[in-house]
């Protein structure tokens, strides 16, 4: 699990990343836009997305919906971060849902690879090292649960 300092850093980070619905929508679009730009092969997992969605994650309904859904899921984890059993259950649920779609732990590692760049862009370079490390630890936990 995560230690107390990591949990605190995640909660602080979430005040910016998940402040409200429009913020989560914007940040979800930003994160997936970076993922698709950096690792175009990851698009294969999004069979319901068309070229317009990939090109404009922040303006298409499907793109915005996926972004806000992902950030809502992250928000559930962070809101529950002090309950290790709940966080573990949420991580396993996320894993089951993604494995069913052919998304592997290696694919999650690609998301982890772009996450620090995402944090810098989403926070206008105001994310602290502690917040980046805590977000990385949460992603590592999700990857480990993804079996």
Swiss-Prot record:
Heme b binds at residues 66, 98. GO terms for molecular function: heme binding; metal ion binding; oxygen binding; oxygen carrier activity. SUPFAM superfamilies: Globin-like (SSF46458). Residues 1-147 form the Globin domain. Pfam families: Globin. It is found in: Cytoplasm. Keywords: Cytoplasm, Heme, Iron, Metal-binding, Muscle protein, Oxygen transport, Transport. InterPro entries: Erythrocruorin, Globin, Globin-like_sf, Globin/Proto, Mb-like_M. Homodimer. Belongs to the globin family. This is Globin. The lineage of its organism: Eukaryota, Metazoa, Spiralia, Lophotrochozoa, Mollusca.
């Amino acid at each position: 699990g995560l230690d107390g300092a990591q949990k605190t850093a995640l909660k602080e980070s979430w005040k910016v990343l998940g402040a409200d619905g429009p913020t989560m929508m914007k940040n979800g679009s930003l994160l997936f836009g970076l993922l698709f730009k950096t690792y175009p092969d990851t698009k294969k997992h999004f069979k319901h997305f068309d070229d317009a969605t990939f090109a404009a994650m922040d303006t298409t309904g499907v793109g915005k919906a996926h972004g806000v859904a992902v950030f809502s899921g992250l928000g559930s984890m962070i809101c529950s971060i002090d309950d290790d059993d709940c966080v573990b259950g949420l991580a396993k649920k996320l894993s089951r849902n993604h494995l069913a779609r052919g998304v592997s732990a290696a694919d999650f590692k690609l998301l982890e690879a772009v996450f620090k760049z995402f944090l810098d862009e989403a926070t206008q370079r105001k994310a602290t090292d502690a917040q980046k490390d805590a977000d990385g630890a949460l992603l590592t936990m999700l990857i480990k649960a993804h079996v």
